[in-house]
């Protein structure tokens, strides 16, 4: 079963993921995109480490982390809504507080999407492979 991958795109902006991907080196970008493709095909019970992490703290329990590494640790915070995945806050993890900052950004993005569902748009990930 293919699930839809959506990304957060506020009006008049390209969105954080579309700004983030070109900053990565080619190998890491390709690995991250392969994980996104895998995410579209994965069963929810297979969202396990090392490539995926579910946050268990109540404040963040609707959020997950897609993880990939090369020379640096690339992460994308995402959520599941109506069976689809919404990719929210991408970041390079350099220190533990980077994750907390991305989680807080993701909660704000989710609030935006609740108020304006059109902020979650289908990702055309095929364009990046």
Predicted regions and their residues:
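Basic, Lys/Arg-enriched alpha-helical interface segments
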Residues: 1-72, 82-85, 92-129
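Short, surface-exposed beta-strand/loop micro-motifs that present aromatic residues
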Residues: 75-79
């Amino acid at each position: 079963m293919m699930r839809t991958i959506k990304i957060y795109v506020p009006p008049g902006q390209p969105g954080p993921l579309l700004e983030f991907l070109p900053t990565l080196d080619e190998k890491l970008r390709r690995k991250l995109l392969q994980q996104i493709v895998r995410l579209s095909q994965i069963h929810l019970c297979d969202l396990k480490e090392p490539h995926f992490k579910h946050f268990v703290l109540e404040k963040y329990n609707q959020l997950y982390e897609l993880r990939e590494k090369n020379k640096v640790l690339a992460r994308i915070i995402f959520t599941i809504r109506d069976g689809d995945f919404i990719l929210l806050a991408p970041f390079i993890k350099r220190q533990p507080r980077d994750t907390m900052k991305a989680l807080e950004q993701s909660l704000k993005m989710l609030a935006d999407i609740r108020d304006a569902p059109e902020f979650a748009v289908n990702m055309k990930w095929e364009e990046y492979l």
